[in-house]
Each structure stands twice: as structure tokens, then as C-alpha cells.
UniProtKB/Swiss-Prot annotation:
Gene from which this protein is expressed: lgals3bpb
PANTHER family per the UniProt record, alphabetical: GALECTIN-3-BINDING PROTEIN, HL07962P-RELATED
GO annotation, cellular component aspect: extracellular region; membrane
Gene3D superfamilies attached to this UniProt entry: 1.25.40.420, Potassium Channel Kv1.1, Chain A (3.30.710.10), SRCR-like domain (3.10.250.10)
Function: Promotes integrin-mediated cell adhesion.
Top-level taxon in the UniProt lineage: Eukaryota
InterPro entries, sorted: BACK, BTB-POZ/Galectin-3-binding, BTB/POZ_dom, SKP1/BTB/POZ_sf, SRCR, SRCR-like_dom_sf
Protein's recorded name: Galectin-3-binding protein B
Database matches in PROSITE patterns: BTB (PS50097), SRCR_1 (PS00420), SRCR_2 (PS50287)
Keyword Methyltransferase among UniProt keywords: no
Localization per record: Secreted; Secreted, Extracellular space, Extracellular matrix
Signal sequence segment: 1-14
Keywords: Cell adhesion, Disulfide bond, Extracellular matrix, Glycoprotein, Secreted, Signal
GO biological process, one term: cell adhesion
Length: 572
């Protein structure tokens, strides 16, 4: 994939598998139901992949409730219910981080992470209260749905070309290759991006010859809305969907791209993917790549690919708070090196724009002191900006937040921490050490002890906040990994799945609760590949490690990864 991504397209044959083998599943796919005492309110459940599952209440609001209630035939929604108010469901948490406009016909048409991609438990199952009224799903009516057969019939219509009245020519000018297809104009009229007029009888599509073998399957999708997508066919299908303006297929194929993201440790594939996402306007693909590169920024900035990153990509990266680096000073040094490598390609205005994304307030105070005497070309050409950043950084470190609150808030997100993994603010746990009898529990300089079997514990002391005001005020943190249900029980914890991790302060955290909050993070990294593939927050000091199928990115090292616990203090 590394070499072929810049070429954009692959000549492959995809595995064909008909979804009609499971008619019962397809007939119910995406349906919702309410589980409660009365028909108009209850826990929301959605049907997918042959089973009912729940919806997480993260992002759950009235717009999402309106879609559910209308899908069930009620006039609208009265209110939402969160926190498992209607009891805890069972099975998978199918949907998380829902984002509906409120006008969708089906809940599954809204934006969400992906089927089964969630870090929620059933304690966060969402519910709704619908307005009572006419319910079109009442037993007084009978719904007849033969849409499954319609899709099959339309597929046969495409195959036969009976009555076709529209010609699509597919060509590659560089190879002088061309294919011709006869289709039905009425089908193409469904896709307004083609801008067909009443007199249009043919169109020509220019695309690489390596994609020509996928064109028939794509055109058949326009009839049936069904297609099998593999990692090797995804690029061509995505490009065709972009040309024809089939946004839904672009988003679905983008999820296949997500599976490719962790496969290249050189980052060349990811950078090419992002630029492709920009060209095709695929915001989902852009976000997935940026998230992965943010998580792996520590490795990215030390790779040869760093100097090839575009200005737009750099600008997008530097604005993110999920960016993982040792500290903010390391990021500034990497930016200075990138600008130096780019030379005259980066104008002075662009330099200023990028430097404004550096969070000088969060640079460790000892490194702020060193930056004063830096002789870098970027520093010399942007002296005023550096001095302003240094002044604000020293003020942030020397003064109580109550004194500088109004000024700091004006700086937007510049006082919000990224994920800083320096030794002062994070600790690592290697899961393989649990079963290693030769492991020295003091090798990192922390007190560590083992539970009866698979539990491992480790301690970290940090200042209450990075500001110099709090340097002498320490908080001790305890990190625990429970690898069996029995270990959870031994510690008085209920866990439905393992591994389960806990990260909590054992002293004095709450004395700062009116000034500081802790948005701590758990980072999972492949030990041998230097590959961060999952980041999540803690809920009530706990984090359930999701299965591979429910992660936003696939786990490339399911049996060989390490945990890193990161403390992230932030002024309130």
C-alpha cells in the first residue's frame, strides 16, 4: 500500500459476496425500538448485524431524540433520557457520539463514530420520551415492505441493460483505454451532482485504467445501493463516488480507509491519504488521518516524512489538543525545523499563522528560559511574536490563575493542554510484565506491586499543575490494570469485560477542585512498532479497553501493546 497510494488507484478484483444471503437481517437493519413501560418512552435500541444493541448518551440531545420518535411514528420528542435512566441494556453499544440534524428519516442516517465503535458501558444507555399521538407502527396497520426484492430486481435490470437510454464512457486518456456502459437515465437522475439536463444522453468519466474493472460494480451500486468493499478496491470506489457525487458511499468507503491507516509506520501512506481526502472533499477521511497523526506525532516529527507535510496539514495538526508529544517545547522545535526545511515556500504570514498555534503558556518554564536565548532563524524573523509568547508563558507560570484568568481566556485554546507524555506527567505499564518472573518492579523508579494474579499497579507523583505556582504541591496517582474478572472482584470493582484500567489520585486532588480539573488520558501503543492506535479518557477514574471491532482504528498488535497513563491538569 505504501508505494501504491501516491499512484492513487490499484487494479484489483474484489471478493464478491451477496448480502441477500441474510434477508431477515436486511429487512430490520437500522430499525429502532423503545424498551420501557409505555410505548412512547424508554431505552433506545437499534438493530444492526443481526442483533439489537443500545445507543451511548455521549452527544445525545433533542435532535437525536426527534429522529428516533419520528422513525417510530410519533409526532416528535419531548425530552431525552441519559445515564441508563430506563435501565441497562445488553449486547453491543452500537452507536456513540451521535450527531443528528433532526431532519433525518432514520437514526442510522445521522453521523456517528461507526457501528460498534464506542468506549461506553450500558450505564450510559440513551433513552427518549416521545410525544404521545398517532403511531404508524400501531397494530391497527400492517406494513408491507418488499424493498429487498426491488433492489434485486434493479440489479438485474442493470445487468440486462433492457430499455437503457443513457451512455457512460469511461476512459483513461494517458492509456487510450475506454469502456462504454448503457444505463438508465432515470436512475442517474437520483444523483443531482451529475447535473443532468433533460437533453443529456451521455457523459464521459476520466479515471485511471486501474479502476476500470471496478466501474461495473459501482454502476450497479447506483441501482441497488449495495456493494462489497475491500481494502484493495476502496480507493477506486471512493474516487468514483466522488465523481458521481454519491456522498453516502464516500463515507462508507472511508471506513475501509480507516483500516489502512495504522499499516504504514513511515507515515507516507497517511500523508497521501490526507491530501487525497482534501482533493475529494472527504472530511471524514481527513479527520481520521489527522487523528492518527496527532496520536503518533512524537514519531512523525522524527521521521523523514515530517519535512514533506503541506502547510494546510501542518496548520490543521497544530490546532489539535489530542496531539501527543513529550512537551510543547518539542513541538516548537519540530515546527522550526519544518519551516527551515521548507525555505521560501512558507511566507512570513504563514509562519506567523503556524506560530500562533504554539501554546507558549504550556511550555515548561525551564525551557521557556532557554528559548529566550535561541538563535533559530524563525525566532530572529519573528522576534515580537516570540517575546509576546515568552512573556505570557512566564506570567502563566508566576501568577495565580485568578490574576490572569481574563487575559488567558482571550487566548482561546492556547491554555488547554495537549497530551504531554514526558516522564513528569505520564507513566507506562507494559502488559507483558505481568507474567514475566524476571521483571524488576522498581526499574522505572516507582513503587510497584502485583495483585494476586494478573493485576498490576504503579504510582506516579506529579505537581498539581504545570504552573510554577504549584511546583511544590504534589499529587500521587495510582494506575491499575485488571486483567481478569476475579481481580476486579478482589478489589471490589464490577467489570463486565477485561482488561479494565483505573487511574485515580490517592492524595489531595480534591483540594484543587475549584481551580483545576484533570482530563486524564489512556494511550495504547504497540511496543515493537511505536504505533499509537487508541486514546481514550477516563470515566469515574475507569476505562474499559474496547475490543478490536469497537475501536475507531484497528488494533495492529492485540497481544503486544503497552499502556500509558497521562495526567492533564487544566485551569477551570
Amino acid at each position: 500500500m505504501l508505494l501504491l497510494w501516491p499512484l492513487l488507484f490499484l487494479q484489483v478484483s474484489a471478493l464478491r459476496r451477496t448480502l441477500f444471503d441474510r434477508p431477515k437481517q436486511l429487512m430490520q437493519e437500522g430499525r429502532v425500538r423503545l424498551v420501557g413501560v409505555i410505548p412512547s418512552s424508554g431505552r433506545v435500541e437499534v438493530y444492526h448485524d443481526g442483533q439489537w444493541g443500545t445507543v451511548c448518551d455521549d452527544g445525545w440531545d433533542l435532535a437525536e431524540a426527534q429522529v428516533v420518535c419520528r422513525q417510530l411514528g410519533f409526532p416528535g420528542a419531548v425530552s431525552v433520557a441519559t445515564g441508563g435512566q430506563y435501565g441497562e441494556g445488553s449486547g453491543r453499544v452500537w452507536l456513540d457520539d451521535m450527531n443528528c440534524k433532526g431532519s433525518e428519516s432514520l437514526l442510522s442516517e445521522c453521523s456517528f463514530k461507526g457501528w460498534g465503535v464506542s468506549d461506553c458501558t450500558h450505564k450510559e444507555d440513551a433513552g427518549v420520551i416521545c410525544a404521545p399521538g398517532k403511531n404508524t407502527t400501531s397494530i391497527r396497520q400492517m406494513s408491507v415492505d418488499n424493498s429487498l426484492g426491488l433492489s434485486d430486481d434493479l440489479g438485474l435490470l442493470f445487468d440486462s441493460e433492457d430499455g437503457c437510454d443513457f451512455t457512460i464512457a469511461v476512459r483513461d486518456l494517458s492509456e487510450e483505454a475506454e469502456l462504454t456502459f448503457c444505463v438508465h437515465r432515470v436512475i442517474l437522475m437520483i444523483y443531482p451532482e451529475l447535473n443532468l439536463t433533460h437533453d443529456t444522453r451521455n457523459i464521459t468519466v476520466d479515471i485511471s485504467q486501474t479502476c476500470h474493472t471496478h466501474v461495473p460494480r459501482f454502476l450497479r451500486y447506483l441501482y441497488t445501493r449495495q456493494i462489497d468493499v475491500s481494502t484493495t478496491s476502496a480507493q477506486c470506489l471512493h474516487q468514483l463516488a466522488f465523481i458521481f457525487g454519491v456522498q453516502k458511499l464516500m463515507e462508507d468507503v472511508g471506513r475501509v480507509f480507516t483500516a489502512l491507516i495504522p499499516e504504514d509506520n513511515t507515515f507516507q501512506t497517511q500523508v497521501s491519504m490526507y491530501e487525497y481526502g482534501v482533493r475529494t472533499g472527504d472530511l471524514v477521511l481527513q479527520e481520521n488521518v489527522l487523528q492518527y497523526l496527532s496520536w503518533n506525532c512524537e514519531f512523525l516529527i522524527s521521521s523523514p516524512v515530517w519535512s514533506t507535510v503541506s502547510f494546510d496539514m501542518m496548520d490543521a495538526l497544530l490546532q489539535r489538543s489530542d496531539l501527543i508529544v513529550k512537551d510543547e517545547a518539542v513541538l516548537l522545535e519540530a515546527l522550526e525545523r519544518w519551516i527551515q526545511d521548507k525555505g521560501d515556500q512558507i511566507s512570513s504570514d504563514k509562519q506567523v499563522s503556524l506560530l500562533n498555534h504554539i501554546r507558549f503558556l504550556l511550555i515548561p518554564v525551564d525551557k521557556l528560559y532557554d528559548i529566550q536565548f535561541s538563535s533559530s532563524a524563525l525566532r530572529q524573523s519573528n522576534e515580537k511574536l516570540y517575546l509576546t509568547g515568552l512573556l505570557r508563558g512566564f506570567q502563566f507560570n508566576a501568577l495565580p490563575f485568578s490574576k490572569i484568568r481574563d487575559q488567558v481566556v482571550k487566548l482561546s485554546g492556547n491554555y488547554i493542554p495537549r497530551i504531554y507524555i514526558g516522564d513528569e506527567w505520564s507513566l507506562g505499564l507494559n502488559v507483558s510484565t505481568v507474567n514475566n518472573p524476571h521483571y524488576n518492579p522498581y526499574q522505572y523508579g516507582y513503587d510497584q506491586r502485583y495483585g494476586q494474579s494478573n493485576r498490576i499497579e504503579k504510582y506516579l507523583s506529579t505537581p498539581a499543575h504545570p504552573s510554577a505556582v504549584y511546583r511544590g504541591q504534589m499529587i500521587q496517582w495510582q494506575a491499575q490494570v485488571f486483567r481478569s474478572v476475579q481481580d476486579c472482584r478482589n478489589s471490589g470493582i464490577s467489570c463486565n469485560s477485561v482488561p479494565l484500567v483505573r487511574f485515580l489520585a490517592t492524595s489531595s486532588q480534591y483540594s484543587y477542585s475549584s481551580t483545576i480539573r484533570y482530563n486524564n488520558r489512556l494511550v495504547l501503543t504497540c511496543k515493537n512498532q511505536n504505533n499509537v492506535f487508541h486514546v481514550q479518557d477516563f470515566k469515574n477514574n475507569m476505562a474499559v479497553i474496547p475490543t478490536n471491532s469497537s475501536m475507531g482504528l484497528p488494533n495492529p498488535c492485540p497481544d503486544d501493546y503497552s499502556f500509558r497513563f497521562v495526567v492533564r491538569p487544566q485551569y477551570i
